[in-house]
């Protein structure tokens, strides 16, 4: 497996719709305003967070059960920023829609700007032939409220291409998150 470069990412996005919408260079500011960077980097793609959030609350739940998750455990927020309570978390989604090639595995790493503030981004790998908006999980590990910015960079996708295509892809096995749009809650 080898990591793919900006040139490969650009070609796959433009010719095969791997990332939509696609920003072909790294954006660090818009006019006089600084933003947390997004777009193509040397060996990855920095994704943006959309303005749809689900902020965790423990008002209605006593137990968090991934096999029987209660949607009332979240408060929906639509805003340019999301405030995550101390020691809590929020779900969001990427602005970008991904179509992963059959011979590629994509790994997501949180941006250091957030990590250095105690905000951790978690995403499981994007498997071969998976497609959809990526659901992002933000953990606020601090004892203070934490702010997430919509439409700015939050994580970096790294594309690893295998020397051969897999026998069975995510699409082949009809994975439960295939084609997801918007913020997607746990499915057991």
UniProtKB/Swiss-Prot annotation:
Protein EC:
3.5.4.13
Residues bound to dCTP: 111-116, 135-137, 156, 170, 180
Q: Which residues form the active site?
A: 137 (proton donor/acceptor)
Could you tell me which pathway this protein works in?
Answer: Pyrimidine metabolism; dUMP biosynthesis; dUMP from dCTP (dUTP route): step 1/2
Identify the keywords attached in UniProt to this record, alphabetized: Hydrolase, Nucleotide metabolism, Nucleotide-binding
Quote the SUPFAM superfamilies the UniProt record gives. dUTPase-like
The record lists the catalysed reaction(s) as: dCTP + H2O + H(+) = dUTP + NH4(+)
Q: Subunit comment for this entry?
A: Homotrimer.
The protein's name in its UniProt record: dCTP deaminase
Q: To which species is this protein native? A: Pseudomonas fluorescens (strain SBW25)
The organism's lineage is: Bacteria, Pseudomonadati, Pseudomonadota, Gammaproteobacteria, Pseudomonadales
UniProt gene name: dcd
């Amino acid at each position: 497996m080898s990591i793919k470069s900006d040139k490969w990412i650009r070609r796959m996005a433009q010719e095969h719709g791997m990332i939509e919408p696609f920003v072909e260079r790294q954006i660090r500011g818009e006019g006089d305003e600084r933003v947390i960077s997004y777009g193509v980097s040397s060996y990855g793609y920095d994704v943006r967070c959309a303005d749809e959030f689900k902020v965790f609350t423990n008002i209605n739940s006593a137990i968090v059960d991934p096999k029987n998750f209660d949607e009332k455990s979240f408060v929906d927020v639509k805003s340019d920023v999301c405030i995550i309570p101390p020691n809590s978390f929020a779900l969001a989604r990427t602005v970008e829609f991904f179509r992963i090639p059959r011979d590629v595995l994509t790994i997501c790493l949180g941006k250091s700007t957030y990590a250095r503030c105690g905000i951790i981004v978690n995403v499981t790998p994007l498997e071969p032939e998976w497609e959809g908006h990526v659901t992002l999980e933000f953990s606020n590990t601090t004892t203070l409220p934490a702010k997430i910015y919509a439409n700015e960079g939050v994580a970096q996708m790294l594309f690893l291409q295998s020397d051969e295509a897999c026998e069975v892809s995510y699409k082949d096995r009809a994975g439960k998150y295939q084609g997801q749009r918007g913020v997607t809650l746990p499915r057991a």
